[in-house]
Curated annotation (Swiss-Prot):
Binds 1 Mo-molybdopterin (Mo-MPT) cofactor per subunit. The oxidation state of Mo is +5. Is inactive in the presence of the tungsten-substituted form (W-MPT) of the cofactor. NCBIfam families: PRK05363.1. Residues 1-44 form the signal peptide. Belongs to the MsrP family. This is Protein-methionine-sulfoxide reductase catalytic subunit MsrP. PANTHER family: PROTEIN-METHIONINE-SULFOXIDE REDUCTASE (PTHR43032), PROTEIN-METHIONINE-SULFOXIDE REDUCTASE CATALYTIC SUBUNIT MSRP (PTHR43032:SF3). Its cofactor is Mo-molybdopterin. Pfam families: Oxidored_molyb (PF00174). SUPFAM superfamilies: Oxidoreductase molybdopterin-binding domain. GO terms for biological process: protein repair; response to hypochlorite.
Amino acid sequence: MKKNQFLKESDVTAESVFFMKRRQVLKALGISATALSLPHAAHADLLSWFKGNDRPPAPAGKALEFSKPAAWQNNLPLTPADKVSGYNNFYEFGLDKADPAANAGSLKTDPWTLKISGEVAKPLTLDHDDLTRRFPLEERIYRMRCVEAWSMVVPWIGFPLHKLLALAEPTSNAKYVAFETIYAPEQMPGQQDRFIGGGLKYPYVEGLRLDEAMHPLTLMTVGVYGKALPPQNGAPVRLIVPWKYGFKGIKSIVSIKLTRERPPTTWNLAAPDEYGFYANVNPYVDHPRWSQATERFIGSGGILDVQRQPTLLFNGYAAQVASLYRGLDLRENF
């Protein structure tokens, strides 16, 4: 893609605009302006690499063994590893994009327990080693689109969620899948202090319809760039649903429960008119306070190289997933 050297001011400052708008939601939850501005040092750290300056590499995780199936490889330009692991939303560790990388080292990911329960014939529990050894791992290069209208392309490593669910044998009553993040206030400052964590109700919870969870694209993710996930990216295991906005990609999962009824989800509870259950990437359905028609791709350049590009329906995965929503009004079911 040819670089646009004549960026509009809105292209360069869009992140501050979107962050201020997200702050409006958090303010409605009772979070003060002072708290929302902390910590200021994170801004300087973040801007250092947006200006093209060198940053220390993300903490190295354990190297993983994985295959690279041709079906999941492509020629999309990758977002550099330091940006994938240095520009994150993980409010359990703070509101600024650099806070997770700065603060998530406190999260203990081994030992770890992931329980699969609910409407299943065979409930099961996985430990830390099971997450990387029980299923063949594969690298998948996926687009990632945040609801804040920025995007990345990331080489995730993991296994299809449907393989895990198949072991548990969902019953005929199972219609939805509910996910839950670890609740560990002593390790996650945002869970301990509502000002640091944006006033959200914790633990963070998410959900999918069962057919969405069983789709081949839906990935239980344990690594990135060839190594185990760093804590700020959701170690030791997170969800990636590439046709949905990033907040559906729940991190540091400890519970998967199959249910009869649609489960609650964190951002929908916080602002139901702004964050729907489905959260499918859709350039034709705007957020109430900003457009979703375009996005800023975070690539290898500095802030002056940031590109605005059209957002693709279902984030470019329409051919694979559009049939899941046949007959569903995507404006009503956003």
